[in-house]
Structures are given as C-alpha cells and as structure tokens.
Regions:
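Low-complexity, Ser/Thr/Pro/Gly-enriched N-terminal "stalk/linker" regions
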Residues: 1-35, 46-59, 64-70
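Catalytic cores of nucleic-acid ligases and guanylyltransferases
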Residues: 40
Length: 130
C-alpha cells in the first residue's frame, strides 16, 4: 500500500506528463493508448486530481472513432498504430464509471455516457453466438 506521500508523488508524476488537451503518454512525448490512459486517469482520481482525470476522459471523448472505439496508439494527435482492440476500447467504460463513483459528477457521466454506449455497441458487434 502506498503512503499518502507516495500516492501524492505518483499522481503528481502522472499529471506532469499530461498534455493540456488531457492526453497522458507513457513517458514525456511518448505514445498514448486508451487502456493505459484510463489506468492513469483512475490513479489521478484516487489521488484526488479529479479535474486532471476528467481532462483525460475528454481526450478520449474527442478522439472516439465513428464506430465507438479508438486506435491502439497515438503520439500527440498522430495515430501510430491503427489497430482496433475491443478489450482496450471497452476498458474506457470502467474508467468513466470509476470517475463518476469518485466524484458523483453527474454532468460528466451524462457527457460521457454516449461514449460508453457507443463502445459497448462496438464491442458487442464482435460477440459470437457460440
């Protein structure tokens, strides 16, 4: 378990690499993927940096593809791996719900719920009958 000082240092480090538009790369100026961005945003929420976490979800909101998912990797605004992964895309819903539970921010949930619905629709397109 992290001490309060360790938690603060961890979330401060995450916030230090977050860009103004909300993107959270693995390392400064490095690649970003939806799964790890959600993990980082959830850590920001645990550390009480709710506005920073919301900006991360806004980044995802603004880059959602028409079918409901995201590409696998981005550097800045450039797609560096156009692979589509339903597992990664669906994880965004976990983060959205975690942020809501951390903040009780119903305006955030209303803004992000269409994203959650779209990603579930996208993922369920790949569900098999067997």
């Amino acid at each position: 378990m992290l001490t309060p000082d360790e938690l603060r240092a961890t979330v401060d480090d995450i916030a230090s690499v977050q860009s103004a538009d909300g993107r959270i790369p693995w390392v400064p100026d490095g690649k970003t993927d939806p799964w790890n961005l959600v993990e980082a945003a959830m850590a920001l929420d645990v550390g009480g940096r709710h506005d920073d976490a919301a900006r991360a979800y806004d980044w995802l909101h603004d880059r959602r593809l028409p079918h409901g998912g995201w590409h696998s990797y981005y550097v800045g605004d450039e797609v560096t791996d156009p692979t589509l992964d339903t597992n990664v895309s669906a994880y965004v819903a976990v983060g959205v719900w975690h942020h809501y539970l951390s903040t009780d921010d119903t305006a955030f949930l209303r803004r992000m719920w269409p994203v959650v619905e779209a990603v579930f629709d996208h993922v369920l397109e790949f569900q098999s009958t067997t």
